[in-house]
């Protein structure tokens, strides 16, 4: 019994449970409820989780909102700061505008003052430039005048001898004969007229030669400066020198012609009346002066009479001065530009050598190449009747036919010596004065 009961219980228990589980409606409902509850619980759990997540999200949102609020606050603060900065900037702009207005006023005042100062400065600059230019021109004029007087004085005795030789029938250039003629005429002048006779007629050409030299040098330098401004002549400087010298020669011919005419009339006073071309009153031993011959020429021929011999003068001076200045400038460059230093007597003398050699050589080239025209000028100007020669080339033709080709260089020995020494002295004086 006990065993059976046990078995039955066991079985019953199991069975009961199973039966209860399967067949009892309440249990089924309970189970369903439990299931539902579990589901609900699960749902609740899920909802709780969702709520937690929502809460977290809300917290995050709140944090974000707080951050945004903080950012907004920061932005507001920045905006406030910017507004303050803008206000400050506006104030600064206002201050700057005021300062700018003041600066503009000051600038305008300064401009007015500067304009006034510039006008004063320009006036002073013009005045300074004018004075500087005037000083240079005055120095150049003084140098030219001094050069002309020194040149004329140094070469005048030989110029007188040259004129006498050119007018004589016996003096022929070359060899000992010419040297004898120079010495002979030199002795004759001193014997018959004294030492002062070597300077007969000097007073008029002395002053006028200074004027001629001033015009000659001034015109040459100004013309040369003009030519050298042009690129073509910068690349062909020799042409600049030739053209400038030619222009200076053309201008000076209109001054030297009347001067030489009066000078030659005075120089031939000592020639014996038996010689042709003497045209003087030797019966009166008292020499006539410049004023006498100036009045005589004007009375007989008028103003145009002073330009007797202008044609050969132009033939001599236009190409002559072109050669003269070109030779001088070229040789001076070859010898080296001298510095007129006074450091010692030896250096002072050495600095003169390039000038002396350049100036003297230029004079010899000038008169050597134009000497036939100088002879024609002398013969035409010594013919007071102005009927013997029809012109320059007619004069040269007659000289050539009557006396041979050598006569075209009659008196050149005296001319060469005179040209070298007078032009050497002339350039030396000029360079010394303008470099002082």
UniProtKB/Swiss-Prot annotation:
Membrane topology: Multi-pass membrane protein
Pfam families noted in UniProt: Mito_carr
Location in the cell: Mitochondrion inner membrane
Transmembrane stretches, start-end: 138-158, 195-215, 239-259, 314-334, 348-368, 414-434
Matching InterPro entries: Mitochondrial_Carrier, Mitochondrial_sb/sol_carrier, Mt_carrier_dom_sf
Keyword terms: Membrane, Mitochondrion, Mitochondrion inner membrane, Repeat, Transmembrane, Transmembrane helix, Transport
Region (Disordered): 1-102
Record topology, Mitochondrial matrix segments: 159-194, 260-313, 369-413
Segments on the Mitochondrial intermembrane face: 1-137, 216-238, 335-347, 435-436
Gene Ontology CC: one annotated term: mitochondrion
Broad class of where this protein is predominantly found: mitochondrion
Keyword field contains Glycosyltransferase: no
Solcar repeat ranges per the UniProt record: 135-226, 236-334, 350-436
Keyword Transmembrane included in the entry's annotation: yes
GO biological process: mitochondrial L-ornithine transmembrane transport
Gene Ontology MF annotations: L-ornithine transmembrane transporter activity
Family from the record: Belongs to the mitochondrial carrier (TC 2.A.29) family.
Function (record text): Mitochondrial solute carriers shuttle metabolites, nucleotides, and cofactors through the mitochondrial inner membrane.
Protein name, as recorded: Mitochondrial substrate carrier family protein Y
Organism, as annotated: Dictyostelium discoideum (Social amoeba)
Gene: mcfY
């Amino acid at each position: 019994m006990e065993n059976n009961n046990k078995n039955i219980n066991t079985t019953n228990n199991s069975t009961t449970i199973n039966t209860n589980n399967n067949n009892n409606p309440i249990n089924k409902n309970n189970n369903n409820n439990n299931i539902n509850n579990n589901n609900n619980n699960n749902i609740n759990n899920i909802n709780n989780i969702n709520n937690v997540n929502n809460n977290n999200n809300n917290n995050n949102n709140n944090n974000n909102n707080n951050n945004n609020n903080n950012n907004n606050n920061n932005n507001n603060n920045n905006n406030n700061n910017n507004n303050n900065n803008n206000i400050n900037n506006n104030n600064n702009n206002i201050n700057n505008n005021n300062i700018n207005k003041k600066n503009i006023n000051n600038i305008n005042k300064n401009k007015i003052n500067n304009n006034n100062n510039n006008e004063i400065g320009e006036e002073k600059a013009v005045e300074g430039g004018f004075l500087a230019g005037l000083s240079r021109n005055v120095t150049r004029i003084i140098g030219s005048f001094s050069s002309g007087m020194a040149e004329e004085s140094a070469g005048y005795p030989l110029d007188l001898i040259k004129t006498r030789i050119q007018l004589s029938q016996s003096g022929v250039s070359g060899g000992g004969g010419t040297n004898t003629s120079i010495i002979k005429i030199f002795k004759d002048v001193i014997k018959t007229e004294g030492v002062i006779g070597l300077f007969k007629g000097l007073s008029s050409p002395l002053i006028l030669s200074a004027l001629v030299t001033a015009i000659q040098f001034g015109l040459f330098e100004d013309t040369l400066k003009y030519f050298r401004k042009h690129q073509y002549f910068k690349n062909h400087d020799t042409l600049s020198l030739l053209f400038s010298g030619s222009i200076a020669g053309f201008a000076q011919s209109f001054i030297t012609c009347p001067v030489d005419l009066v000078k030659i009339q005075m120089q031939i006073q000592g020639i014996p009346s038996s010689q042709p071309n003497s045209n003087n009153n030797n019966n009166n031993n008292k020499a006539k002066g410049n004023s006498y011959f100036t009045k005589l020429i004007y009375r007989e021929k008028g103003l145009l009479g002073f330009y007797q011999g202008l044609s050969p003068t132009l033939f001599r001076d236009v190409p002559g001065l072109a050669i003269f200045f070109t030779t001088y400038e070229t040789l001076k460059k070859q010898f080296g530009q001298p510095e007129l230093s006074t450091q010692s007597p030896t250096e002072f003398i050495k600095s003169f050598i390039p000038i002396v050699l350049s100036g003297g050589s230029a004079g010899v080239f000038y008169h050597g190449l134009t000497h036939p025209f100088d002879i024609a000028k002398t013969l035409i100007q010594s013919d007071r009747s102005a009927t013997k020669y029809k012109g320059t080339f007619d004069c040269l033709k007659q000289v050539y036919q009557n006396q041979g080709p050598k006569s075209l260089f009659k008196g050149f020995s005296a001319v060469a010596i005179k040209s070298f020494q007078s032009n050497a002295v002339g350039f030396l004086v000029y360079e010394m004065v303008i470099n002082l």
